[in-house]
């Protein structure tokens, strides 16, 4: 593809796909976010929700977390040597 066509193609994609999607998202998400902001008007409610969210996020483990912990255990065993 010739280089001068690339910016034109990107601009076309941006105007045809991304801008309408952003408009739709704004149209549907803004009222929801405003309603949520009204419900979370009190500082206590915001702190409680943030605490719950942080707890949930702290409980999530990546798929590699189990593998990494197994490797860590094996490395620890090698460093400590045979157990009596």
From Swiss-Prot:
Membrane topology (UniProt): Single-pass membrane protein
Transmembrane helix found in the keyword field: yes
CC per GO annotation: endoplasmic reticulum membrane; Golgi membrane; plasma membrane
Region annotated Disordered, chain positions: 62-84
Extent of motif AxLyCxL: 48-57
Transmembrane feature ranges: 5-25
Alphabetical list of InterPro entries matching this protein: Myomixer
Transferase in keyword set: no
Residue intervals annotated with topology Cytoplasmic: 1-4
Domain of life: Eukaryota
Biological process terms in GO annotation: myoblast fusion; myoblast fusion involved in skeletal muscle regeneration; plasma membrane fusion; skeletal muscle organ development; skeletal muscle tissue regeneration
Family membership noted in the UniProt record: Belongs to the MYMX family.
Disease tied to this protein: Carey-Fineman-Ziter syndrome 2: An autosomal recessive disorder characterized by weakness of the facial musculature, hypomimic facies, increased overbite, micrognathia, and facial dysmorphism. Some patients manifest failure to thrive, axial hypotonia, and progressive scoliosis.
Function: Myoblast-specific protein that mediates myoblast fusion, an essential step for the formation of multi-nucleated muscle fibers. Involved in membrane fusion downstream of the lipid mixing step mediated by MYMK. Acts by generating membrane stresses via its extracellular C-terminus, leading to drive fusion pore formation. Acts independently of MYMK. Involved in skeletal muscle regeneration in response to injury by mediating the fusion of satellite cells, a population of muscle stem cells, with injured myofibers.
Assembly information from the UniProt record: Interacts with MYMK.
Name the UniProt record assigns to this protein: Protein myomixer
Organism from which the protein derives: Homo sapiens
Gene: MYMX
